[in-house]
Amino acid sequence: PTDDEWALTRRAALYKLERRTFIPLQEIIYQLLGAGTGPGRGQRQEEEERFERLRALVAAQPQSFLEIQPSHQSPSEWKSAIALFDSMDNYSLPSEKAAVLVEVARCIYETHGREHGADAVGGSGASPQKQPTPMAAADFLPIFIFVLARCHLRSVIVTRHLVSETMITALMIGETGYYATMLEAAIGYIAAFDGAAKAVGRSSGSGSTATSSF
């Protein structure tokens, strides 16, 4: 077998292991993460309700408030990516939710390329091709925050814990790990939102984002 075939086999085995370990413990895990009953449920519920209020405030802001550059703002307001985020509730395994997270990110890039590509004529006889304006990580995060704020996930906080804390470590590599970090950063921004300052990262020049206590 080639290296790619071994990698696919290993990943399939890890997914199977996750399914066998997570499903039997799913109810307990959700209770521990705040989706069930038990000690501390009231406090967790208050924290989540506070977060959802802040998320609604962020969702009410235009793209420009989050310092999404005009060259990156979406005329469709990233509806395709938001719809993908909404579908995350249809999955239970952490790896499945993480896979949706990666698809959301790819959809953002695809939407950007489709909506902001510039016609560029190639060599002799070449037909015009769409050349999207490059999007750096600093450009991506505000868009991701916008999408997260406007999606309809039942519990962003529980989703964050499932992806970041219960997923098999070996699966948290590459794109999955990167966008899980983006999710953490987006939640941190929303949790620290005060409705006044634009604090996605560029305003202070530090490039940092707020951290979340959730």
Set out the residue ranges of the language-model regions.
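Acidic, serine/threonine-rich, charge-biased low-complexity segments
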Residues: 1-10, 121-127, 206-214
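Catalytic and GAP-homology cores of small GTPase regulators
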Residues: 1-109, 115, 119, 178
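Short, hydrophobic/amphipathic alpha-helical patches that form generic packing surfaces
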Residues: 20-27, 141-151, 158-165, 185
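Intrinsically disordered, low-complexity regions enriched in proline, serine, glycine
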Residues: 33-34, 114-118, 156-158, 172-176, ...
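Short alpha-helical "patches" and their helix-cap loops
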Residues: 37-45, 156-169
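Eukaryote-specific, cytoplasm-facing alpha-helical/coiled-coil scaffolding segments in long proteins
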Residues: 44-62, 125-128, 139-147, 166-177, ...
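Extended serine/threonine-enriched, polar tracts that run as long, contiguous segments within proteins
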Residues: 88-156
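C-terminal regulatory/linker segments that are acidic, Ser/Thr- and Pro-rich
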Residues: 180-214
